From Swiss-Prot:
One GO term (biological process): translation
Entry protein name: Small ribosomal subunit protein uS15
Signal peptide: none
Molecular functions per Gene Ontology: rRNA binding; structural constituent of ribosome
GO CC list: cytosolic small ribosomal subunit
Oligomer status and interactors: Part of the 30S ribosomal subunit. Forms a bridge to the 50S subunit in the 70S ribosome, contacting the 23S rRNA.
Function per UniProt: One of the primary rRNA binding proteins, it binds directly to 16S rRNA where it helps nucleate assembly of the platform of the 30S subunit by binding and bridging several RNA helices of the 16S rRNA. Forms an intersubunit bridge (bridge B4) with the 23S rRNA of the 50S subunit in the ribosome.
Record-stated family: Belongs to the universal ribosomal protein uS15 family.
Keyword tags: Ribonucleoprotein, Ribosomal protein, RNA-binding, rRNA-binding
Species in which this protein is naturally found: Orientia tsutsugamushi (strain Ikeda)
InterPro entries hit by this protein: Ribosomal_uS15 (IPR000589), Ribosomal_uS15_bac-type (IPR005290), uS15_NS1_RNA-bd_sf (IPR009068)
Amino acid sequence: MSITVERKKALISEYADLEKNTGSVEVQCAILTERIINLTQHCKINFKDFHSKRGLLMLVSSRRKLLSYLKKKDLNRYTQLINRLGLRK
């Protein structure tokens, strides 16, 4: 199941520094994390769905790339985002 429009707006308002700044790394990682959580639940139920599993791996990879970019650019924002998202780094 994908993210609803209301949930995406809530994530944008929670993680964006400005209201219209939807392209910031924090917002993108938050949206990707929400999609990863939904897709992980789907893959646990439908364990033979290899297309969704590949999509999940692609989402995790893109989030990892964004997080490594943020870690390179601003370590303080990176650690705050990791703590807010509840990731284990």
